[in-house]
Swiss-Prot record:
Name of this chain's protein: Acyl-CoA synthetase FUM10
Keyword Nucleotide-binding: yes
Function summary: Acyl-CoA synthetase; part of the gene cluster that mediates the biosynthesis of fumonisins B1 (FB1), B2 (FB2), B3 (FB3), and B4 (FB4), which are carcinogenic mycotoxins. Within the pathway, FUM10 is involved the addition of the tricarballylic moieties to the carbon backbone. FUM10 catalyzes the CoA activation of citrate to form tricarballylic acid. The biosynthesis starts with the FUM1-catalyzed carbon chain assembly from one molecule of acetyl-CoA, eight molecules of malonyl-CoA, and two molecules of methionine (in S-adenosyl form).
Gene3D superfamilies for this protein: 3.30.300.30, N-terminal domain of ligase-like
Phenotype of the disrupted gene, per the record: Impairs the ability to produce fumonisins, but accumulates two new metabolites, HFB3 and HFB4, which are biosynthetic precursors of fumonisins lacking the tricarballylic esters.
Region (AMP-binding): 463-536
Family that this chain belongs to: Belongs to the ATP-dependent AMP-binding enzyme family.
Entry keyword Nucleotide-binding: yes
Gene: FUM10
Species of origin: Gibberella moniliformis (strain M3125 / FGSC 7600) (Maize ear and stalk rot fungus)
EC class of the enzyme, as a word: ligase
Length: 552
């Protein structure tokens, strides 16, 4: 890969390669599919023409409601080539969740699979509610060099008053580094998702950090088992593989034969959140043990317990942890791949990462406090001049603040969130607690935010509370985090009821309104919800009370 490539468009040199870019493993109903780079480029260009025909151009937004697979990859790349913005959406989102996100981003097109294009599909219903056009990504057999092609077929025109005209098809030379590429949505403490837009430059900074730290080359094969609607799936796994000329193996779902598949497909690395690592360790190994082709395994997205860390270390494969956020581009803090497997390699510690040259890191200690306890209640500890407290001093605990070309410009159309997230000197407040260690390592020690991190899925307590209060028998609700050995954190929900109500009824209500991973794991009936002096529910206190057994 040309390390000076300034845009996320497949280098033209790769168009002539017959080496595989994507492999879709066989399933019970389908055969294995190997897609060379030449074929991937042709598929991408074909879909780019379809997008142009549908009126997609510079700055247009395409909501990609597709599962992991070839269709997702090609629609993503085609949108990038057309200088438009890709907005990946969880394919299992409910109608209400899709409608909320579509209202926030106003997509010019919603892309779905043919099976998802039925009038009853959640994304289609949400698009119809808002008058948005929907296109399904169809596969057609053909003769010649390519055995099949992909095409976007309009299945719902949306608002009848809109009839977009065909647009220019852009070449690679037209694409600019400042073009926006991705729009993703993060959970906010107010409950409403916040829109994050990233440019080519934002993502390329992260990709260069990743490929350099992990020494990823065209010889590598990644096993992509993380969702592509997450930043780590797209920019932390898929794109680093493709832009080094490697091969991404993308299963339709997580196979129980994972380790055998790693051996069969000569996988050299994979990424998983700690929850998924727990599950993978329960899967059977091939007769020869851990596949010999594995160079490293990678983890990120949530905290890793020391027990899991030690169990993964026993596999005998280098374990590389990464840390980043949607707002900062993914995995900007990477454990480097060891030069050797001997004692010269750096000893690993969970939650510690070298600070890259491309990212400026400072710590914001709290006012009137010598240290900050992880997940502590921060009410009233901030002052009006946090910039003066920023420090690079070793050993000082506080909020991690970052600045660099990888950082988003700001939350889209959300000045209030931007005032809260950015300091006057441009540093972004991550909401994570850390400390700078000797040798310029960053150690994570906790979180300021109340966001719940369930196995890498970020959940806003305010969103869960809002949905719970929609039940006509719920008087009040407070959502809080519960520590969990497998997921790291799970969702607790304390409610006060207007009259008799069952926990089963509350969970059924929640399942109707939110995607499954947001349904509370524990629902507790309480006499009163504790609030602080400013009227905010004391979620941290509820977590502490639960830990002490006071909310059983």
């Amino acid at each position: 890969m040309d390390t000076l490539t300034h845009v996320l468009v497949l280098p033209e040199a790769l168009e002539r390669l017959d080496s595989p870019s994507i492999i879709i493993p066989r399933t019970a109903n389908t055969s294995e599919e190997v897609v060379p780079y030449a074929h991937l480029t042709d598929l991408t260009q074909s879909l780019q023409h379809d997008l142009a025909t549908l009126g997609i151009s510079v700055g247009s937004k395409v909501a990609i409601v597709l599962p992991n697979g070839l269709a997702f990859v090609t629609v993503l790349l085609a949108t990038i080539r057309q200088r438009a913005i890709s907005a990946p959406i969880h394919p299992n989102s409910t109608r209400e969740e899709c409608k909320q996100i579509f209202s926030l981003m106003t997509p010019d097109l919603v892309a779905v699979m043919p099976s998802e294009a039925s009038p009853a599909a959640a994304a289609v219903l949400a698009a119809q509610d808002l008058g948005l056009p929907v296109a399904s990504c169809h596969r057609y057999p053909q003769s010649g060099r390519l055995s099949f092609c992909l095409a976007l077929k309009l299945v719902n025109r949306g608002d009848e008053t809109s009839n977009p005209s065909p647009c220019m098809v852009y070449s690679r030379d037209h694409v600019l580094a400042e073009d926006k590429v991705l729009e993703l949505f993060t959970s906010g403490t107010t409950g409403a998702p916040k829109s994050v837009q990233l440019t080519h430059t934002n993502i390329l900074v992260a990709m260069r950090i990743i490929t350099s730290a992990h020494k990823i080359t065209f010889k590598d094969r990644s096993f992509l088992i993380t969702p592509l609607f997450h930043i780590i799936g797209i920019a932390g796994s898929l794109l680093p593989t493709l832009f080094t000329g490697g091969c991404a193996v993308i299963p339709a779902s997580l196979p129980a034969t994972f380790w055998q598949d790693c051996q069969d497909y000569s996988i050299t690395w994979y990424h998983a959140v700690p929850t998924l690592h727990h599950l993978l360790l329960s899967f059977p190994m091939p007769k020869g043990g851990v596949p010999a082709t594995l160079r490293f395994i990678r983890s990120g997205g949530s905290d890793m317990s020391l027990d899991l860390f030690n169990r993964l270390q026993k596999l005998g494969v280098p374990l590389l942890e990464v840390y980043g956020m949607t707002e900062t581009a993914p995995a900007i803090f990477c454990n480097p791949f060891p030069v050797t497997e001997t004692s010269t390699a750096i000893k690993r510690h969970p939650g510690q990462y070298p600070i890259p040259d491309a990212v400026d890191v400072m710590i914001l200690p709290p006012e009137r406090a010598p240290g900050l306890e992880p997940n502590g209640d921060l009410d009233g500890i901030e002052n009006t001049e946090p910039v003066a407290r920023l420090t690079k001093e070793l050993g000082v605990k506080g909020e991690i603040c970052l600045r660099g070309k990888n950082i988003m410009a700001g939350y889209t159309n959300n000045p209030a969130a931007n005032r809260e997230a950015f300091l006057p000197n441009g540093f972004f407040r991550t909401g994570d607690l850390g400390v700078i260690k000797p040798r310029q390592y960053l150690a994570l020690i906790g979180r300021v935010k109340e966001i719940i991190n369930k196995g890498g899925e970020k959940i806003s307590p305010a969103e869960i509370e809002h949905v719970a209060r929609l039940h006509d028998q719920v008087n009040d609700a407070a959502c809080f985090r519960i520590s969990d050995e497998i997921y790291g954190e799970v969702i607790g929900l304390a409610i006060t009821a207007k009259s008799a109500i069952t926990i089963t009824a509350v969970k059924k209500h929640m399942r109707h309104h939110v995607v499954m991973f947001k349904v509370p794991d524990k629902v507790l009936l309480v006499q009163e919800i504790p609030y602080n002096r400013t009227g905010k529910p004391r979620r941290t206190l509820l977590s502490e009370m639960y830990d002490r057994g006071e909310l059983a």
